[in-house]
Amino acid sequence: MAQHTDVCIRGAGIVGRTLALLLAREGVKVALVDASGAPSGEHRDIRAYALNANSRALLEALRCWPQAEHATPVLRMEVQGDDGGDVHFDAASAHAPALAWIVDVPALETRLAEAVRYQPHVELMSESVAAPLLVVCEGRSSRTRAELGVHYDVSPYPQTALAARVHTGMPHGGTARQWFSAEGILAFLPLGGANGQEVAVVWSVAPERAQALMELEPPEFASTLAQASGGALGALHLQGERCTWPLQLARADRWCGALAGTGTSWALAGDAAHTVHPLSGQGLNLGLADVQALARLLTARSSWRSVADMRVLRRYERERKTALLPMRLSTDLLAQLFARREPGVQALRNWGMQGFDQIGPLKRWVAQQAMHPAFLIDPAPISGRDFS
């Protein structure tokens, strides 16, 4: 390892590796700490993320975008309410090649790992090293965040997310599907290309229902899933394992700070700083936007400023908290709205969905916000005097 390290990043997941590559290409010397160890490979990794156009452009710039078979374009999206309220989006109406891309996590992690391996300014470590700036990208259960004494404000949802992969009897046609029902929120995310017959499933239900679904035999689970989706893609067959995790809305009260008497500053990014309900499909997009903003501000700083300069880090915190707020509020509002079972509320929300689906300009604007959020800060460099 070089004698001097500029930035130590704890957490070598997608967000941490992306930050390491962004900084390293600007000549910043990075120690990337991966304390998790290599995956066992005993079970197939079923994780998939919906990435927007901003995230794709970022990863393509780093030459880390997965091959086509691992990044399926979402050409259409169908959202069905629990009593006749439907909303439809399509990429053509939004004048875009895709609304989003569903990316296999193992494929993306492999591309990032390869890029890190051949980046001379990044060294992969098993333990943390001293550096002027520590960036925490350890996820929602970050131990380092707790050690720093940062309060993580958590509001649990009365739901657990269940994830699975299933083979479908009919091609998905590049359509992402989402159902809101009395039982919860079910999403089918297309995989394997526009004519593929595999989907990633995310089913948000009550914890006891999630446990019951986990205990079903694969054929029975697939049958239950097909019924919940109204047979939209024909007969379903479970592929591999299922997994669950509790849902929560969370945000750290502080995203940066200084360690007294050490000359070291710290910052949080990704799920270590915030989490939202998965119904938005924006979790990883928000984390990638965090590190893109942090890297931009660090590399745009005046030469006389250290990477540990608190003015730079506070600017990052202000920008990202402001950018996060619209998605945080809208996602939480939808989650709370569809969790209510009163007949009047149910009728009102479905009426609202039907009306929304008829307003073409509004639908196109919403689709554009999902693909290219207007509240993302312009990535153009800024001068050192802008830090205050």
What are these regions (language model features)?
Residues A2-Q3, A57-A61, H70-E147, D153-T160:
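Conserved N-terminal helical subregion
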Residues R296-S388:
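C-terminal helical "tail/cap" subdomain of flavin- and related membrane-associated enzymes
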Residues R209-A308:
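FAD/FMN-dependent oxidoreductases across multiple families
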Residues V7, V30, P132-L134, A267:
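Hydrophobic "anchor" residues on beta-strands that sit immediately upstream
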Residues H4-C8, A12-L75:
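Glycine-rich FAD cofactor-binding loop and adjacent beta-loop-alpha segment at the N-terminus
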Residues G11-G16, G139, G270, G283:
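Conserved phosphate-binding and hydrolysis motifs of nucleotide-dependent enzymes
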Residues L59, V136-T244, R251, C256:
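Conserved FAD-binding catalytic core of PHBH/FMO-like flavoproteins
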